[in-house]
Amino acid sequence: MSSDSEMAIFGEAAPFLRKSERERIEAQNKPFDAKTSVFVVDPKESFVKATVQSREGGKVTAKTEAGATVTVKDDQVFPMNPPKYDKIEDMAMMTHLHEPAVLYNLKERYAAWMIYTYSGLFCVTVNPYKWLPVYNAEVVTAYRGKKRQEAPPHIFSISDNAYQFMLTDRENQSILITGESGAGKTVNTKRVIQYFATIAVTGEKKKEEVTSGKMQGTLEDQIISANPLLEAFGNAKTVRNDNSSRFGKFIRIHFGTTGKLASADIETYLLEKSRVTFQLKAERSYHIFYQIMSNKKPDLIEMLLITTNPYDYAFVSQGEITVPSIDDQEELMATDSAIEILGFTSDERVSIYKLTGAVMHYGNMKFKQKQREEQAEPDGTEVADKAAYLQNLNSADLLKALCYPRVKVGNEYVTKGQTVQQVYNAVGALAKAVYDKMFLWMVTRINQQLDTKQPRQYFIGVLDIAGFEIFDFNSLEQLCINFTNEKLQQFFNHHMFVLEQEEYKKEGIEWTFIDFGMDLAACIELIEKPMGIFSILEEECMFPKATDTSFKNKLYEQHLGKSNNFQKPKPAKGKPEAHFSLIHYAGTVDYNIAGWLDKNKDPLNETVVGLYQKSAMKTLALLFVGATGAEAEAGGGKKGGKKKGSSFQTVSALFRENLNKLMTNLRSTHPHFVRCIIPNETKTPGAMEHELVLHQLRCNGVLEGIRICRKGFPSRILYADFKQRYKVLNASAIPEGQFIDSKKASEKLLGSIDIDHTQYKFGHTKVFFKAGLLGLLEEMRDEKLAQLITRTQAMCRGFLARVEYQKMVERRESIFCIQYNVRAFMNVKHWPWMKLYFKIKPLLKSAETEKEMANMKEEFEKTKEELAKTEAKRKELEEKMVTLMQEKNDLQLQVQAEADSLADAEERCDQLIKTKIQLEAKIKEVTERAEDEEEINAELTAKKRKLEDECSELKKDIDDLELTLAKVEKEKHATENKVKNLTEEMAGLDETIAKLTKEKKALQEAHQQTLDDLQAEEDKVNTLTKAKIKLEQQVDDLEGSLEQEKKIRMDLERAKRKLEGDLKLAQESTMDIENDKQQLDEKLKKKEFEMSGLQSKIEDEQALGMQLQKKIKELQARIEELEEEIEAERASRAKAEKQRSDLSRELEEISERLEEAGGATSAQIEMNKKREAEFQKMRRDLEEATLQHEATAATLRKKHADSVAELGEQIDNLQRVKQKLEKEKSEMKMEIDDLASNMETVSKAKGNLEKMCRALEDQLSEIKTKEEEQQRLINDLTAQRARLQTESGEYSRQLDEKDTLVSQLSRGKQAFTQQIEELKRQLEEEIKAKSALAHALQSSRHDCDLLREQYEEEQEAKAELQRAMSKANSEVAQWRTKYETDAIQRTEELEEAKKKLAQRLQDAEEHVEAVNAKCASLEKTKQRLQNEVEDLMIDVERTNAACAALDKKQRNFDKILAEWKQKCEETHAELEASQKESRSLSTELFKIKNAYEESLDQLETLKRENKNLQQEISDLTEQIAEGGKRIHELEKIKKQVEQEKSELQAALEEAEASLEHEEGKILRIQLELNQVKSEVDRKIAEKDEEIDQMKRNHIRIVESMQSTLDAEIRSRNDAIRLKKKMEGDLNEMEIQLNHANRMAAEALRNYRNTQAILKDTQLHLDDALRSQEDLKEQLAMVERRANLLQAEIEELRATLEQTERSRKIAEQELLDASERVQLLHTQNTSLINTKKKLETDISQIQGEMEDIIQEARNAEEKAKKAITDAAMMAEELKKEQDTSAHLERMKKNLEQTVKDLQHRLDEAEQLALKGGKKQIQKLEARVRELEGEVESEQKRNVEAVKGLRKHERKVKELTYQTEEDRKNILRLQDLVDKLQAKVKSYKRQAEEAEEQSNVNLSKFRRIQHELEEAEERADIAESQVNKLRVKSREVHTKIISEE
C-alpha cells in the first residue's frame, strides 16, 4: 500500500482510486471477532452482515446489523474477513472467498466511488452513472510504466500492462471489455484508446492534405476522433443504456518497433439496421438524427430541407426523442469536428449529411391504393421530391421504381405491381440499406485515413461488443448479440480455466485438474451447429414459400424437449408475444421470430438500387457499386467473399463468418479481461442491487477466476530470463567461471533467498510463481541494486579522496624541502667562502657551456640525419595509410551492404512468418468452413433420402385413392336414389346432428387440453429426471465438502483458542498503553513549559547581539587608536636601535684601538679607564633607555594583545551574527523586492482600471452625443418622408410618361430590395444570437452554482478529514506509548513504532513539497490573474471601440440613405423607383430605429456589467495583495522546512524500505507468529552488533584523543629537556612564550564560546588569564635582555629551526585535539539551538498554517468569482464575434451592391449626360467609402478572432486554476497532519541531542582538565628557565667584572 504522499501524483483522482492512510489505520484498529462476525442469507438483500449469538444442532442464531434476529442453517452462514481486507483492491487476497465477501467488497468500494477492482487476473468495473475525475492527463501520467501492484486498480493499469507485455514479450495483445448492456463498456473502450494515444504518441502531423487544403491532425488525434463519429452513427438510447453501442467493433492499434503509434484499423460487426425504421417506446434511434435536428448548425437544417422537430419524421419519433445525459448540440459539434479531423472531403461530408436527411424523409413518404385496384400510388410528391433532391435522383423515377419495380423473369424484365404495404416495406428496406452501407463506407474511409503506411510490428486490439441484452421484445439482432457474448464468455472460460491448467500439466507441475462447471458449449452448439437455429433459419430462407410459422415449427420439431437450453416460453400479460426461449449464461431470453426470414434475406428493390448506382452523388453511387437485391456485405467496411452461392449471402451467415474471424484474432493474442458490472437497473449513482450484481458475478466467472488465481501460478518466467534478472539477489549462489544449467541455477538462487518456498514451482522450461511473489522479488531486486550502487559510489569517492590526500602529502613535503633549502641559503649567503663560490661558479659554467655547445652541435647533426630518415619513413607510411584507408572504406561499404541485405532478409523473414501465420489462420477458417459445408451436405442428403421415401409413399397413396374413387363413382348412383328417400329423414335428424356437433366440439377441446397437459407432464418428467441426476451428484459433492468443512472447523476451533489467548495479551498491553499515555501527557506539558523558557532566552540572546554590535564599533575605533600608538612606538624603538648600533660600533673601534695600543702608558690606561667608565655610564643609560622603551612596548603589546584577543573573539562571534543577519537581510530584501513587484503590479492594475473608467466615461458621453445626433437624423428623415409623400401625388401624374425609364431602372430597385432584405435577415440573426448568448449566460450561471455546491461539499469533506486526522493523531500517540513501554518485552513492536514515526517524517517531507508546490501555484495564479485582468480590460476597450465603429457605420448608412433621396429629387427619370424606394426606406428606418433602441438597452446592460466588473477587479486586486503577503509567509516556512528536510532525508531513506516490510508483517502477524519471533531475534542481534560497533567506534575515538594527549605530554617533556639543554638560548624561550601567548588566546576563545553552557570553567579561565599576564611580564624581561645576547641568538638559530619543526608537529597535534573538543562543543550547542528553534518554528507554523488554510479558502471563493466573471466576458466576446461575422456578411453584400451600382452606372451613362456624370462621381465616392469600410471591417474581424482565442484560453486557465486551488487545500490539510507528527519526532531528537551533549560535555571537561595540567607543567618549565636566566646573568656579570 502506498502512502498518501505517493498517491499525490494522481491529483484529485486519488480518493477515487485508493483508501487513505487514515482509513487503512482505522480498518486495522477496528474491533473484530472472527468467530461471531458473519454474513447470513437474507431473502431481500441476498446477504447481510450479522453477529452470531448461538449455534445449536446445525442451526445458527444471528443478529443482523438492522437489529433483527434470524435463525439459519450452517451452510447459509459465511465467515466475514478481518477489517483490514475492507475495500481490498485485489479480491484474490481475501482470507475467506465466497459470494457475500466479493459482493460486499464491491459494494463498499462502489460506495466510496472506487469503481475498479482486481479479481485475480482480470479487472472488474462497476458503472458509476456519474462523472468521476479519474481519467485526466495527470492520472494517465501516473499510471505510465507502473507495475500492476504499484498502482491502484484502473483501466489505465490494464492498458499499460498490455502495452508493456507487448514490448517485452513481443506478442500481440487484446483487451476484452465485456458485460451486459449499460455496464460501461463503451466508456472504458474510449479510455483505453485515450491512454494509448497519450503514452505512445508520435507527435508528427500527417503529410497528406485534403482537397480543402487543411492539414490533418496527428494519428493519435484521428484515433480518438474516430470514436465520436462512430458513436453518432452507431450508438443509440436503449432501455438500459443511454449510449448503447448498436454495433460491435474491434479496434486494432498498431505499434512500431520502438513502441510508438504506427497505425490503426477498425472492424465492425452487425450494425442494428432495424433501429433506423423502428424503436421501442423507451428507446430512440441513432444519435445523429437528433444531433442534426438540435439546430446547432442551422445551415444543415436548410441544406437537408428538414425541421427541428423530431415528431415531424416517423422513422425517428417512435420512442423518446431526448436523453437527459446527452447534449445533442455539443455532440453535433464533436461529430462535425471528427469528420474534419479524419480527413473526409467537403463533398463527402455533405454527402453523409444528405444521405442521413434522405433516410428521415423516406419515413414520411405516403402511398395510397388506387381505386378498384390493389396497386399502390403516391399520396403526394413533396416528400419524395426532397428525398430525391438530397440523393441527386429524379423524383418521378424514384416513385415509379417504388410503385412499379421491374423484375427479371428469365431473360426479360417485367414491370410488377406493388401493394401499399409492399411499397412501405421496400422504402424501409432502402432506408436501412442506405444507412448501413453509409456506415460501413465511413468505417472503410476511417481505416484508409488511419493507415499511415509506417512500419508496424505488433498490435493491441480493443474489443467493444454490444452487451448481453434481455428486452421485452427480442428479435434476430438480440440473438446475434447474445450469441457473440456467449462465445466471448466461452473464450474467457477456456483461457482462464482450461488453458491455464493444461499449461501446468505440460510443464510437469503437480496439479489436480479442477472443473469449474463453466462450459457453455451446449448453448453455442444449439445456435451455430448443423440443424441449429442459424442453420434452420438459413434453410428456410432458401425456400420461397417459407413463413415465420414454418420456421417456428421446424425449431420446435428439432429442439423442443431435446435440448435443455431451448424452451417454450410461458405467455405473460402485457408483454409482446414470444415464440421460443434460450437459456444463456446470463439468463433466459424470450425471442420473437416475426420477420426473421426477411431480415436474414435483407431484400432490396433492384430498380431503386439501379437508380442509386446512376446517381450524380458519387458517394451514393459508390455505396451501391455491384449491388443486387440481396447484398454480400462484410463487417468493418471490408467486403468478404460470398459463401452461399453467387446470388446472395444471408445476414446470419455473414455474421457467423465475421464472428469466427474475430475469435481467430483473439486466439492469436494474449488477452486481458475487463468485466463490466451494472449496479442497478434505474441508473442511480451509488446504488447497488445485490441480486443483480450476484447474477452477473456468477455468469462472468468472477469467483472461479479468483480461485484459479489463488490456487494456481499466474506468474511465470523462463529459467534463463529468471537467472539473468534475479541473479543479483544472491550472486554467490551461482558459482562464477563454471557452466551451470539455467534451471539448476534458478533452483539454487530461489533456495538461497528468504521467501516462502511453497509459493513457487519448477516446470520443464519455466519457473511458476503464485500471485504476488514476483512483485516481492522485484522489490528485493530494487533494494539490492540500491545497496550495490551506494556501495560502489562510496568506494569511488573514497578512492578519489585518497588520491587527493596523497597529492596534498606530496605537496607538503615539497614545500618543507623548499623552505629548508631557502633557510640554509639565507644562513650562508654572507659567508666569504660562499661569496667566493658565487663569483667562481659562473666561470665554471661558461667552460661547461662551451663543452655543452660542442656536444649539442654533434647531437644536432645526428638528429638532422635521423630526421631525414624519419621523413622518408613517414612518407612511406602515409602512402601505406592511404591505401589502407581505401581498403577500409571498401570493407565498410561491403559490411554496410551485407548489413542492409541482412536487415532486408530479416524483414522478409518477419513478413514471411506473418504471412505464414495469416495463411495458417485462413487454412483453419477454410477447414472449419469445409467441415461445416460437409456437415450441411450430409444433412441435406439425409433429408433428400427422407423426402424420396415420402414421395414413394405418397404415390402409393395416390393409386389407392384412384381405386377408391372408382368405387365411389359406382356407389354414387346407388346413393342418389337413397338420398331422395333419406331427405325426409334428414330433416328429422338435423336437430340431433346439431346437438352432436356441439358435443363433438366440446370433446375435441377436452381432448386437445389433455394432449397439452400430457405433453407438459412429459416435459416435467424429463426435467425432473435430469434434476434428480444433478441433485444426486450435488449430494455426493456436498458429502465430500461436508467432510472437508468438518476438518476446517476443527482447525478453526484450534485457531480460535489461540486467538483468544492473543486477545487477552492485547487487552493487557492496551491497559499499559493508557497508563503510559498519561505519563507522556505530563512530560509534554513540561516540555511546553521548557519551550516557553527557551523562547525567552532566545529573545535575550538577540538583545545581547544588538549590544555586541555596538561594542564592536567602539572596539574598532579603539583598535585604530592603538595601532597609531604602536606605529609611534615602533618609530622610537627604531631610533633607539640605531643609537645602540652606533654605540656598539664606536665600542668596537675603541676596543680595537686599545688592542693596538697594548703597551701604552699609564696615562693612556687612566684615559682608557675614564673612557671605559664613561662608556659604562653611557651603556647603562642606553640600557635604561632601552628598558624603558621595552617596558612601554611590552605594556602596549600586552594591551594590544589583550584587545586583539578580546576583539578577535568578539569579531568571530559578531561575524557569525553578521552572517546570520546578512542572510536574514538578503531574505528580507527578497521579500521586499517581491512586495515591491506586487505593489507595482497592483498600482499598474489600478492605473489601468482608472484609465478604463475614464475611457468608459468618455465613451458614454460620446454615445449620448451620438444618440442625440441619431434623434435629429430621425426627425429629419420623418420630415423628408412627409415631404416625399406630398410630392408623390405630383409624381404620379408623370408616371405614364416615364414608363420606359421605369423598366430600365427596375433592376436597380430589385438590387436595393435584396439589400434591404439581407439587412432584415441579419437583424433577425443578431436577435437570435442575442437570445442564444442569454441562454449561454444562464447555463454558465447554473454551472457556477453547481461549482459552488461542489465546493461546499469539498469543505464538508475537508472538515471530516480534519476530525479523522485528530483521531488518527490520538491513535498514533497511543501506539507510540505502547511501543515505548513494551520496548524490552516486545522488540518487534518497538521497531514498528520507530518505523511508523520514520514514515511520518517522510510524510512531513512530502507535505513540505506539497506546500512548496502550492506556493508556486499560488504565485502563478496571482500572476496569471493579473495578466488576465489586464487583457480583459484591453478587450473591453476593444469592444467599446468596435461599438463606436458600428455607430459610425450606422451614420454612414444614414448618409447613404440621404444621398439616394437627393438622387431621387434630382432625377425625374427615376420617379417610380424613387417613390417605392422611399417607402421601403421609411419602413427600414423604423426597423433601424427599433434596433437602435435595442442597442441602447444593450449599452445600458454593458454599463452595468462594466461597473460590476470594476468592483470585482478592485476586489481581486485586494485579494492579490493579501495573497502576496501570504505567499511571502509561505516562502519563509518553505525555507525553514527545507533546512529540516536535508537533515531528515537520510533517515527517511533508511526507514522507507523497512517500514513497508514491517507493515506487511503486521498484516500476517496471526499466521506467521513464529517466523516473526525468529526475525525479531535476528534483528535484536543485528542491533546488538550495531551497538557494539558504536561502542568500538567511541572507544577508538577516545583512544585516538588519548594518544594525541599523550603525544602532547611527550612533546611538553621534550620541550622541557630542550630548555634544560639550551640554558643560554633566550631566543628559544621567547618563541615558546609567544606560542604560549597564542595558546592562551586560543584557550580564551574556546572558553568564551562555551561560556553560556560551561559556567563552572570560569575559575579555570581566570587562572589562565593570570598566568598569561605573568608570562607577558616574563616576556618583557626577556626582551630587555635580548639585545645583550643578539650575537648568541645568531649562532643558535640553526639549532632552533630543527627544534622548531618538532615543536610545530606537537603544536599541530594539540591544536587538532582542541579543535576536536571545540567541534564537539559546537555540535552540542548547535543541536540545542536547533531544538529550540524547531520547537518555536513548529508552534509558529501551526498557527500560520491555519491562517493559510483560511486564506486559501477565501482565495478559492474569489477565484470562482473571477471564473464566472471571465465566463461573462467570454460571452460578451462571443457576441462581438457574432457581430463581426455579421459585419463580414454585410461587407459581402456591400461588395455585391457595388457591382450592381457599377452595372447601373453603365446603363445610366446611355440615358443621361449631365445627371449621369454627377451620379458617376457620387457612385465612385461611394465605392471608395465602401472599400475603406471593407478594410476596416476585415481588421476588426481579425482583432475580434484574436480576442476570442485569448478569452477562450483564459477561461480554460481559470478552470484549471480552480482545480489546482482545490488540490492545494487538500495538500495543506495533509501538511498540518504531518507537521504534528514532525513535532513529536523533533522532541525525540531533542532528547537524543541532550544525551549526546551530556556525553560531549563530560569529554570536554576531561580534556579541559588535561589541558590545564599541561599548562601547569609548562609554567614549571618556565620558572626553571627564569632561574637559569638569573644564573646566566650572574655568570655574565662575573665574567665582565673579571675582565
Swiss-Prot record:
GO terms for cellular component: A band; cytoplasm; cytoplasmic ribonucleoprotein granule; intercalated disc; muscle myosin complex; myosin filament; myosin II complex. Pfam families: Myosin_head, Myosin_N, Myosin_tail_1. Changing Q1539H: Found in autosomal recessive deafness; uncertain significance. Changing I993V: Found in autosomal recessive deafness; uncertain significance. The keyword Zinc does not apply. The modification Phosphotyrosine is found at Y389, Y424, Y1492. Residues 33-82 form the Myosin N-terminal SH3-like domain. Residues 86-782 form the Myosin motor domain. The modification Phosphothreonine is found at T64, T69, T419, T1241, T1265, T1286, T1467, T1501, T1517, T1730, T1736. GO terms for biological process: muscle contraction. The keyword Secreted does not apply. It is found in: Cytoplasm, Myofibril. One of its GO terms (molecular function) is microfilament motor activity. Residues 659-681, 761-775 are annotated as: Actin-binding. The modification Phosphoserine is found at residues 1092, 1096, 1162, 1237, 1243, 1261, 1288, 1292, 1303, 1306, 1474, 1495, 1514, 1542, 1554, 1574, 1600, 1603, 1714, 1726, 1739. Muscle myosin is a hexameric protein that consists of 2 heavy chain subunits (MHC), 2 alkali light chain subunits (MLC) and 2 regulatory light chain subunits (MLC-2). Interacts with SLC26A5. This is Myosin-1. It comes from Homo sapiens.
